[in-house]
Structures are given as C-alpha cells and as structure tokens.
Amino acid sequence: MVQHFDTLLVNIGQLLPMESKGPKRGKEMSELQLLEHAALGIRDGKVAFIGTMVEADTFTANQMIDCQGKLVTPGLVDPHTHLIFGGSREHEMALKQQGVPYLEILKNGGGILATVEATRAASEEELITKAICHLNRMLSYGVTTIEAKSGYGLDRETEWKQLRAAKAVGEQHPIDIVSTFLGAHAIPTSHRNDPDRFLDEMADMLGEIKEQNLAEFVDIFTETGVFTVEQSRTFLQKAKERGFGLKLHADEIDPLGGAELAGELGAISADHLVGASDQGIQKMAAAGTIACLLPGTTFYLGKDTYARARDMIDQGLAVTISTDFNPGSSPTENLQLIMSIAALRLKMTPEEIWHAVTVNGAHAIGRGDTAGQLAVGRAADVVVWDAKNYYYVPYHYGVNHVHSVWKKGEVVYERRRAFEGLSISR
C-alpha cells in the first residue's frame, strides 16, 4: 500500500526505536531493538511509519531525507539538571587543583553559596536568557527532553523566581522541560542552626507551587551534613500528600539510607547513589524506583569511587544516567560525554547506555508516554547521528556526533560542516 508522509527518512543504517511499555530493568537493558537498512516516516509531527527500506520502497513524501547509512535514535533525555542559576564558578577549579578544601572555599563565600548569591541577584529575565544558552548546547548534543531543578535560591522569593524562569524557558525553547522543586537543596546560612524551620518554610510553598503548576516533582538532598533521613521523610511525605512525584539526591557520599527511603516512599527516582547500600538497592528494585546515576559529577570532582551500576543492573534496577548539569560539580551540557564515562567507569554496555539516555531517562521524569522512544503515534523527536552504528557514539568520546535533531517532526538543529568541500593539496 502506498503511503505519503510529510518527511521520510530513508537509507538509515541502524534505527533504534527503543519502544517499551515501561522502563527497562536489569537484564532487559541489554535487549536492544535494532532495525537495519531502515526508514522512518513522519506525518503531522508524529512518527507514522517505522520499518525497512524494502517496506518503504513505494512510499512518497513532501521531503525525502537520505540518511546515507547513518544511525537514527530517539531524542535523548537528560533527567537531572540544575538548569536555572546565576553566575559561574570557574575560579574554583584552580583552587581545588591546589588542594584547597571545599569547606574553605565555602567559608570564603564560594561553593554553592556563591551560586545562591548570584541567583538571588539575577533578574528573572537574566536567568531565562542564560538558561536558553545552556539549552541550545544541550539540543546540539541530541537532547530533546530534560528535567530542571530549582534549589539555588534557598529562600521563598528566589525559588519562585527559578520555577517561573524554568516554565518560561520551556514555553520558548524546543526542548521539553519537566520542573522539580528542590528548595531543600542545602541549609542556608540564615537557618544553619535550625534546618527544621527552613524545611517548614519550603514545605509552606508546596500548595501554591501545585496550584500554579510550577513543578511536577519535589526533591531533597539527603546526605551527611545536609538533611537527615527523618527530615527528608517528613518533608517528602508532605509533598506526596500534595500530589507531587518524589525524587531524592541520595547517598552521594555516605550510605545514609537515602536509597532505602526512596524505595519506602515509592520515589520515581533516587539520584547519585555513589554510597548506596545493598539493602538500599534492593528496596529501590522492589519499589520500582529508577536509579539516576551521575558519573560526570564523580569524574569532575576527581573522585575514584563511582556508583555501582553493575550491581544495580544485576539486581534488577532500571538505571538512567544524566549530566547533573550545574555550575559547581558538573558544568557540562554534553550527555554524549556522560555516555562515554558510563562505559568507561560504570562499566555499562552500549545497549544499557542507550536505554539509560532514552526510555529509562523518560520514565525517571514521568515522560515515558511522550519521550525517549520512536513508535507510531508518538512525537517525532529524532536524532540523526554522524555514526554508522550505536557503538560508535560512546566509543569516540569528547566529540559531538549529532548530524541533526528533529523535534515534533521539524529540524531544530543541524550541525554546520565547516570542512565540507575543503580540498587539501599536497
């Protein structure tokens, strides 16, 4: 039967649909769907056909795109970012290299306090403009959906400002943004001796945030020196009662019990997990909580111990990975680089990595029905890669392999070819 499309991508070398009814868990992460010599049809911004070139032989289209044997995948999903912030902290890199402890940097007004101060000082429009620049970079690396957290305000006024900025940016930019309220990111100096009162103040914001639809999820930093398991439980239960999905920054340094709490409360994800215990991993697996691993942060901080991705996958967890884009511990928008670090340091296979940055990332932010997959009837969020196979992207690290990015069936990014047509005489 002859079909007609708005756009037909043909001569695809490898096509990864990543179609799944739920997140891929454990051994399922190694079971990769793969079509070779494939075609993909787009109509009205949605995927209308996925199949082989033989099947597509008689199809017509308003525009026919010859992929010339390239790899095609869903748009990538970055499920943990701190997109909205003021300032930057490049001067701290040299201090860290000189062995200056973080607490000393913090004492001198650096660290997260510097970002809090800069974010408080920035106007909402300045935050929006800055965020769009970061989103443009993310888009260029093949990312079409992200999660964005507040958390650099640590006061009512600035947290509101961050949430409003995230919503405004999402309305202006092709990348879809899922917003998370992380008011409980750290203990501000004003409440150093009374963190419970600070958490009460943040909890008082929940009702209005929900009414204004400024966030879908609530997160808290459960870690030694920040918020205890009990404080986190109380705060997250209040969020759950308001109808928010739950997330945790859990056990980044110490096995405090954040992973166990995530499983207990049925959180959609627990993130970091470098110090997660065996019991915590088991509780997360039993609850269906997704492990969001952030190896770029471990890499940037120069630490040797990474999250135990292999143990998590072997125990049946769904694992995703993310940039953790932020100005202090992971200043990168490059999710492709994180894929390489996941291969080299987390010992994840290419098949596991592709599930982590597509379908599992989407489910970790409540977008399993709209992102991270290519299936008939779904939005045509597509990446065409300058690669012949899916192994190549994590293998050739530090390089942007994106040829073009499509959002809802339209090209929103295409990499310029600076050397195309250049002849070299010998």
Swiss-Prot record:
Its main location: cytoplasm. Binds 1 zinc or iron ion per subunit. Zn(2+) binds at residues 80, 82, 249, 324. Its cofactor is Zn(2+); Fe(3+). 4-imidazolone-5-propanoate binds at residues 89, 152, 185, 252, 329. Its EC number is 3.5.2.7. Gene3D superfamilies: Metal-dependent hydrolases, Urease, subunit C, domain 1. InterPro entries: Amidohydro_3 (IPR013108), HutI (IPR005920), Metal-dep_hydrolase_composite (IPR011059), Metal_Hydrolase (IPR032466). GO terms for cellular component: cytoplasm. One of its GO terms (molecular function) is imidazolonepropionase activity. It catalyses: 4-imidazolone-5-propanoate + H2O = N-formimidoyl-L-glutamate. It comes from the Bacteria. It is found in: Cytoplasm. Pathway: Amino-acid degradation; L-histidine degradation into L-glutamate; N-formimidoyl-L-glutamate from L-histidine: step 3/3. Signal peptide: none annotated. Keywords: Cytoplasm, Histidine metabolism, Hydrolase, Iron, Metal-binding, Zinc. N-formimidoyl-L-glutamate binds at residues 152, 326, 328. Fe(3+) binds at residues 80, 82, 249, 324. Disulfide bonds: none annotated. GO terms for biological process: L-histidine catabolic process to glutamate and formamide; L-histidine catabolic process to glutamate and formate. Belongs to the metallo-dependent hydrolases superfamily. HutI family. Catalyzes the hydrolytic cleavage of the carbon-nitrogen bond in imidazolone-5-propanoate to yield N-formimidoyl-L-glutamate. It is the third step in the universal histidine degradation pathway. This is Imidazolonepropionase. It comes from Halalkalibacterium halodurans (strain ATCC BAA-125 / DSM 18197 / FERM 7344 / JCM 9153 / C-125) (Bacillus halodurans).
